[in-house]
C-alpha cells in the first residue's frame, strides 16, 4: 500500500458499487490521513490504517494515459472503459476501438477536419489499425473485405437515442460513395452516379418522414432501417435498397408533452408556398392542428423546418419521384 501514499498518484476509489478515478491529493504521516480527490470533484478522507485493496488500488499506466484500442487496457472493467472514453473525448478523440468494435461518443459539436475529403483519402489508403480509430477505417475495411473475402459484408450501428446513429450511417455511405467513384476499371456511368446520389441524399427524406423531436433528442429516428448496397465487380455502387421497420405509428396521433409529430408535417407548413397550401387546404401554421400542437411544442430553435422542406423537395428529384 505504500505506493499509494505519494501525492499525485492515480488510483481507483471504490464508492459503494462503483469505481471512481481519483488522485492522491495529500498524505499526512503524522495523523495517517490520506486525502483523495475524485475526478468528479468528490474529496474523500481515509485513514491509512483502514486502507485495503478493495477500497483503493493503483491505476494501471494504460488507464492513466489512455489507449486507442481498449482491448489493450491493463485493467478491463466498466470504470476503466468509461474513463478511457472520457480521456479521449476531452481531446476530441471521439472514436475508440474495442478490438473489431468501434465505440463513438457524440461530441455534440463540429470537429474541424474530422470528415474532410483529405481524411477520406487518407483512410482509403490504409488498413484497419494503421491509423487512429475512425468510422472511415471501418467503412474502408468493409469495402476492402468485399474483394478479399468475396463475400457480403455487414456493419451494425446501435446506440441509445442521440448517440449519433443517423450521422454515423451518413458518414459510412459518404465514404462508400467516394470509394465507388474512385474504383478502378470502367469509370462510373451516369446511371451509377445517380444511384450513388440517390442513396447518399436519401437521408433528408428518411429523416423528414421518420424523425421527430423528443425530450432527449431533437432529431430522433423513430424507426430502424436496413440499408443494402450492391457493388459491381469493378467496385462501383450499382444499386441499393433501404428497408424501414418498427415505425412509431402512434406518434402521428399522440405525442408526449414537449415532443413533436414527424418533421415532415411542420416543414410542409413552414415551406409550402401559398398556392400549395391553398391546393391542399392547409392553414398557415401547425398551431391550428390538434395532432401537431397537442404536446405544447410546435417549434424548436435548433430545427429549421423551412430548410428541411427545401431539402426534401430538392433531393426528392434524385429519386425521380412522381406526384
Roles of regions detected by a PLM:
Residues 2-14:
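Short coil-to-beta transition motif at edge beta-strands of beta-rich domains
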Residues 4-6, 21-31, 36-323:
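N-terminal switch/interaction subdomains of large nucleotide-dependent motors and GTPases
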Amino acid at each position: 500500500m505504500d505506493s499509494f501514499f505519494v501525492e499525485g498518484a492515480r488510483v481507483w476509489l471504490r464508492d459503494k458499487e462503483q469505481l471512481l478515478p481519483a488522485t492522491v491529493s495529500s498524505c499526512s504521516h503524522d495523523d495517517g490521513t490520506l486525502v483523495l480527490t475524485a475526478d468528479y470533484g468528490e474529496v474523500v478522507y481515509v485513514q491509512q490504517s483502514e486502507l485495503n485493496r478493495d477500497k483503493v488500488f493503483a491505476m494501471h499506466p494504460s488507464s492513466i494515459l489512455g489507449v486507442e484500442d481498449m482491448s489493450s487496457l491493463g485493467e478491463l472493467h466498466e470504470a476503466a472503459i468509461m474513463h478511457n472514453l472520457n480521456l479521449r473525448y476531452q481531446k476530441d478523440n471521439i472514436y475508440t476501438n474495442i478490438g473489431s468494435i468501434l465505440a463513438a461518443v457524440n461530441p455534440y459539436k463540429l470537429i474541424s477536419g474530422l470528415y474532410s475529403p483529405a481524411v477520406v483519402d487518407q483512410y482509403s489508403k490504409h488498413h484497419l489499425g494503421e491509423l487512429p480509430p475512425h468510422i472511415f477505417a471501418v467503412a474502408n475495411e468493409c469495402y476492402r473485405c468485399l474483394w478479399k473475402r468475396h463475400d457480403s459484408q455487414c456493419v451494425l450501428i446501435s446506440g441509445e437515442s442521440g448517440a449519433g446513429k443517423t450521422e454515423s450511417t451518413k458518414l459510412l455511405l459518404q465514404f462508400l460513395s467516394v470509394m465507388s467513384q474512385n474504383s478502378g476499371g470502367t469509370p462510373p456511368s451516369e446511371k451509377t452516379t445517380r444511384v450513388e446520389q440517390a442513396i447518399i441524399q436519401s437521408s433528408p427524406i428518411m429523416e423528414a418522414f421518420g424523425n421527430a423531436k423528443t425530450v432527449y433528442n431533437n432529431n430522433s429516428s423513430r424507426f430502424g432501417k436496413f440499408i443494402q448496397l450492391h457493388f459491381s465487380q469493378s467496385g462501383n455502387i450499382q444499386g441499393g435498397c433501404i428497408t424501414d421497420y418498427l415505425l412509431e405509428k402512434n406518434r402521428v396521433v399522440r405525442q408526449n408533452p414537449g415532443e413533436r409529430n414527424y418533421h415532415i408535417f411542420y416543414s410542409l407548413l413552414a415551406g409550402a408556398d401559398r398556392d400549395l397550401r391553398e391546393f391542399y387546404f392547409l392553414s398557415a401554421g401547425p398551431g391550428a392542428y390538434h395532432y401537431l400542437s397537442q404536446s405544447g411544442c410546435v417549434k424548436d430553435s435548433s430545427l429549421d423546418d423551412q430548410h428541411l422542406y427545401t431539402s426534401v423537395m430538392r433531393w426528392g428529384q434524385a429519386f425521380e419521384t412522381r406526384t
